[in-house]
Amino acid sequence: MQTIDVLIVGGGVIGTSCAYELSQYKLKVALLEKNAFLGCETSQANSGVIHSGIDPNPNKLTAKYNILGRKIWIEDWFKKLIFPRKKIATLIVAFNNEEKLQLNLLKERGIKNSIPVENIQILDQQQTLLQEPFINPNVVASLKVEGSWLIDPLIATKCLALASLQNNVAIYSNKKVTKIEIDSDDDFLVFINNETTPQFKTKKLIDAAGHYADWLAETTQVDNFKQTTRKGQYLVLKNQNNLKINTIIFMVPTIHGKGVVVAEMLDGNILVGPNAVEGIEKNKTRSIDLDSINQIKTIGKKMVPSLQFENSIYSFAGSRAIDIETNDFVIRTAKSNPNFIILGGMKSPGLTSSPAIAKRAVELLNLKLKKKINWNPNYNLSWI
């Protein structure tokens, strides 16, 4: 049995962000991932957007950590972790007067969420069509917001993991946590893959287990928060007709459900989606269904009529973990054990927020931290 100072359960972008943040300290840190590869659940199956902060309710943790996380990505992590990315504006489009009114509310929300006034403007129909010539000409107005970035979330997760590995964080795949017990010394004894004896012992545990974060806390008997699922499906189109998309195009989120985008990916293909389907069984959140594909096509065509869905090359699905009580991030110590750190409810903008969430998780560990003299935070995956 290995004794670890801090054990992280979950190898998505949240877990690997925690590993990277902890890698700078003189600690024995390990990360456990149940799958063969890191980041192959929620972290892989999302839009890959570092959000500007236009959408979250200012009173929610999602807004707070969106602002903080985006700042860390741009001002710190992007300088140390080199992988493909593109700075891009967001364009939220309105097709009637009711939606146009929502643009003003979104603008006010964005300003409350610390978006600079000069980075957010309402465009009339003509200005919108100049910005996006291929957009539906029935558009009446749009809200343009500067400051988003497109990244590949799977490559970002990989870069965080490799940077952590080079600083002696241990990362294990195919290690499914099946039971956690607490011994008489208040250590967590972690059982893997239904084995009868524990493989790891730790004083501090970070629960970054995505959809199963609530199960992990419950099975450890430290907390009873509950999550549900919100599945989203995407279509990826081969851009064979030189369709130029200059921004990340959204429908008005307060009416149509946040998250549906038409955007040009880093590889030049066109991403359309996701839709939102509530309450799917956790083990079925990656499934593809025809109803969702048709819904995505309808919304995509409304935004950009010249989208050629016959050029679809693949579809994928993923799901956001939703905290049932708050519909917000859950970032705190467990109710009955301060050494168990819960990072739950990791819906959008989880990717954007991940650096700030990781820093908060380290604070919640309440450890006396000593920095490594030879910490190397830099890693380059630009060749991918």
From Swiss-Prot:
Pathway: Polyol metabolism; glycerol degradation via glycerol kinase pathway; glycerone phosphate from sn-glycerol 3-phosphate (aerobic route): step 1/1
InterPro entries to which the protein is assigned, alphabetical: FAD-dep_OxRdtase (IPR006076), FAD/NAD-bd_sf (IPR036188), G3P_Oxidase/Oxidoreductase (IPR052745)
GO cellular component, one term: cytoplasm
Lipid attachment points (S-diacylglycerol cysteine): 18
Leader sequence residues: 1-17
Superkingdom in the source lineage: Bacteria
PANTHER family: GLYCEROL 3-PHOSPHATE OXIDASE, GLYCEROL-3-PHOSPHATE DEHYDROGENASE
Known function: Catalyzes the oxidation of glycerol 3-phosphate to dihydroxyacetone phosphate (DHAP), with a reduction of O2 to H2O2. The formation of hydrogen peroxide by this enzyme is crucial for cytotoxic effects on host cells. Does not show any dehydrogenase activity with NAD(+).
Protein name as it appears in the record: Glycerol 3-phosphate oxidase
Species assigned in the record: Mycoplasma genitalium (strain ATCC 33530 / DSM 19775 / NCTC 10195 / G37)
